Amino acid sequence: DADLAAVYRAVASLADETVRTMAIPLLSTGTFAGGKDRVLQSLNHLFTALDTTDVDVTIYCRDKSWEKKIQEAIDMRTATELLDDDTTVMKELTRVHPDSCLVGRSGFSTVDGRLHSYLEGTRFHQTAVDVAERPTLWPRREEANEQITHYVLGESMEAIRTKCPVDDTDSSAPPCTVPCLCRYAMTPERVHRLRAAQVKQFTVCSSFPLPKYKIPGVQRVACSAVMLFNHDVPALVSPRKYREPSISSESSSSGLSVFDLDIGSDSEYEPMEPVQPEPLIDLAVVEETAPVRLERVAPVAAPRRARATPFTLEQRVVAPVPAPRTMPVRPPRRKKAATRTPERISFGDLDAECMAIINDDLTFGDFGAGEFERLTSAXLDRAGAYIFSSDTGPGHLQQRSVRQTRLADCVAEDVHEERVFAPKCDKEKERLLLLQMQMAPTEANKSRYQSRKVENMKAEVIDRLLGGAKLFVTPTTDCRYVTHKHPKPMYSTSVAFYLSSAKTAVAACNEFLSRNYPTVTSYQITDEYDAYLDMVDGSESCLDRAAFCPSKLRSFPKKHSYHRAEIRSAVPSPFQNTLQNVLAAATKRNCNVTQMRELPTLDSAVFNVECFKKYACNNDYWDEFAQKPIRLTTENITSYVTRLKGPKAAALFAKTYDLKPLQEVPMDRFVVDMKRDVKVTPGTKHTEERPKVQVIQAAEPLATAYLCGIHRELVRRLNAVLLPNVHTLFDMSAEDFDAIISEHFRPGDAVLETDIASFDKSQDDSLAYTGLMLLEDLGVDQPLLELIEASFGEITSTHLPTGTRFKFGAMMKSGMFLTLFVNTMLNMTIASRVLEERLTNSKCAAFIGDDNIVHGVKSDKLLAERCAAWMNMEVKIIDAVMCERPPYFCGGFIVFDQVTGTCCRVADPLKRLFKLGKPLPAEDKQDEDRRRALADEAQRWNRVGIQADLEAAMNSRYEVEGIRNVITALTTLSRNYHNFRHLRGPVIDLYGGPK
């Protein structure tokens, strides 16, 4: 709306003394209106803008109904209202909103009067003065409006003034009394009433512009009654002065003269007295200062240099344009002669060739079959309808949900592969963007350069990988899959409560911890002596060798600075990469568990696969998978690299320099690497014993780079072959998961959870064979399967101090590219073996990695023993009950929403609280992202329908009380960045040499 008004104002600015006529179509209508009727909206902006000029305007339109609307609007504006002699016009009239309590009182009107007033003499005067002060403190309208919302929610004027970054401000101007005509108009009166009612949440419409980010307590709706006028008061335009009629000499040229223009009044009425123009208020009754006449269709004069002198718009006519696309344009008919002989102006003479061109058929180009209907019927009403993209990366707003439908029931749909646009290498553009960034080092230029640089890297990596895998790259035949989409989940309203101070919020969290975990809050880490002094940079510690550079040995550790954590959960900072820690990790965490089983290895594996297919799968696809194997293709390597984010693409670019071909990559080589982060579990364990070092057995980087391309196809095939009630969480958002589970979990329903101890280590030979057989059945091509098989199975190694050679059994290596996928398949296989028909008949079962839940199943005495005897797995079984002991899955609780009657998953607030007590490196810059993530979770915790369930969940799992106070505190801390910074204490410097 604002852009449309600005365009018309720009057109009006082109008028000067030499431009007396304009021919203009209505902008943003027809095909360009986005499926909406914008005729009157566009027309009103045209009136408002061109009222400041002195031109005669011809409006072109092709639609008869539009012509009628436009003519009626012009007639309404040019109509003259006759007033009685004894009528008194009230000059001090203030226009107010139709819903105002001031309607009908002396000095106030709903159709006429001033639009800006302090509302003196009313109880809303002080509020109007306060509202008017905002634009002087914050010139940007969005920022000023945001402060008004804070004022409504109870913030004092003094507090708002202290937030202003400057000391000196101008005097205020009266606020607008009618910003729009809908029920949510933010008039001074409504602001006063909302503030007096001490509301915690209120609604504003789109006529009250706010910043893009979410403001707590403020809901936004589209304005249902926009005021279609420009808030800026038009400049004063003196009335047009008409010259005395005189006979002008005819053109002496021998050519044809076309389109003569009449200047002068054709009206029989005398002009009225000039009236100073007022801001356009009501389109129904407007006094015109000039006589009315109709004129002929006039051509548009050639563009001339614009001048700034404004004129008043006085005459308009609607001239219909022929509707067909190819039709001879006839010269317009002459109108009846005027009462006075007009002055004739000739626009120049045209030769015969130009006349022939003018009289020819005009052809605008025809639409293809169905093209026009498709353009006009395109529904562009949802978020993401308009996709903006940079010159490199993919379009924004195109991340669509893959598991949800807008229908009310579950539907089956074909799976369509998402189209990926391969990156193109353009070194010249990268060089130019680098120069541009060096000359003007702004954030925007830096971002453009980095985008192009990453794009070039990706293009080069794709070429390298395709070259290295050329023996394996073959064309493939696609399978047709069906997926099930679920209705979009419903959530109850989120009502947030905030504490007045962030310091109070931190104190509330610490008080909760001290009451429930007294040993945690009393625990102190002695910073100065917490690390060994054998710091080594650049060490490499593998299972059978260790290497470091002697020149990098130091007598004291590097300097280490971090913010002290204000929340006293005593979580240690990340492990330092010292030789001591790395070797401790390598020696303590590298052995698999003992294998004990009854069936022979291969028999057990075959039985596993048969149970998986019988109890967890349909039988629609296995034959097709065998006929259409999964191979490495150009498309899936391209797709994998294209989706990589910048840092990972740069790392892969470095690793693929001078790369080996795929057939020479050692698939069985794994390097032990240490996870630096400490695993956080709510409780006191981390204070009672030294935190365990987690280890990644990192596969050869090139093995991952070459073979990751087949992962998406494997996921698609697995999801297609599973029963409709069995789900994996691959490629799924939290909202997608809520959509899947929302209808199935009801209060009192039994839910089976299993917690498998040391899942990766416990996988023996039979489970390794099971994984390989399932990969083969899903259609992985034989050459690729041989490569993958080398990374399963046993590894031979050497004990460094003694030189003893030993073998690892077939444990799962956490750094292999298929670890999560195979773990999920084996998890479902274990459930199929021990539950059998109970899994098939369950309403809903979900699996990811070693985590699972199965609805409607209660455990029996044999369940854990079967897992141990048949599958070599030590399993802890939890019988959860909805609403009494809510189930725990993927780091969150599945709770029932009492308002919507559906269930959803919410994150574990206690785990979140413990994580906030982790020390943060001093140079960290990610706090705003952390705050935003915490704010999203806080919004979910504050849903009104899940409060009772969340309390029950925390009580049953952790036996803690008062989690509501913690949620209020976390909501307060996540409210803004200023609050969130209260989690970070002063910077502490460790080491760095003798003191």
Curated annotation (Swiss-Prot):
One of its GO terms (biological process) is DNA-templated transcription. Its cofactor is Mg(2+); Mn(2+). Coiled coil: none annotated. The record marks A385, Y386 as: Cleavage. PROSITE patterns: RDRP_SSRNA_POS. ADP-D-ribose binds at G30, F32. Polyprotein P1234: Specific enzymatic cleavages in vivo yield mature proteins. The processing of the polyprotein is temporally regulated. In early stages (1.7 hpi), P1234 is first cleaved in trans through its nsP2 protease activity, releasing P123' and nsP4, which associate to form the early replication complex. At the same time, P1234 is also cut at the nsP1/nsP2 site early in infection but with lower efficiency. The keyword S-adenosyl-L-methionine does not apply. Zn(2+) binds at C180, C182, C205, C223. Pfam families: nsP3_ZBD, RdRP_2. A motif (FGDF) lies at residues 347-350, 364-367. GO terms for cellular component: host cell cytoplasmic vesicle membrane; membrane. It comes from the Viruses. For nsP4 adenylyltransferase activity; Mn(2+) supports catalysis at 60% of the levels observed with Mg(2+). It catalyses: RNA(n) + a ribonucleoside 5'-triphosphate = RNA(n+1) + diphosphate; RNA(n) + ATP = RNA(n)-3'-adenine ribonucleotide + diphosphate; 4-O-(ADP-D-ribosyl)-L-aspartyl-[protein] + H2O = L-aspartyl-[protein] + ADP-D-ribose + H(+); 5-O-(ADP-D-ribosyl)-L-glutamyl-[protein] + H2O = L-glutamyl-[protein] + ADP-D-ribose + H(+). Viral replication produces dsRNA in the late phase of infection, resulting in a strong activation of host EIF2AK2/PKR, leading to almost complete phosphorylation of EIF2A. This inactivates completely cellular translation initiation, resulting shutoff of host proteins synthesis. However, phosphorylation of EIF2A is probably not the only mechanism responsible for the host translation shutoff. The viral translation can still occur normally because it relies on a hairpin structure in the coding region of sgRNA and is EIF2A-, EIF2D-, EIF4G- EIF4A-independent. The genome codes for P123, but readthrough of a terminator codon UGA occurs between the codons for Ala-378 and Leu-380 giving rise to P1234. P1234 is cleaved quickly by nsP2 into P123' and nsP4. Further processing of p123' gives nsP1, nsP2 and nsP3' which is 6 amino acids longer than nsP3 since the cleavage site is after the readthrough. This unusual molecular mechanism ensures that few nsP4 are produced compared to other non-structural proteins. Mutant viruses with no alternative termination site grow significantly slower than wild-type virus. Polyprotein P1234: Inactive precursor of the viral replicase, which is activated by cleavages carried out by the viral protease nsP2. This is Polyprotein nsP1234. It comes from Middelburg virus.
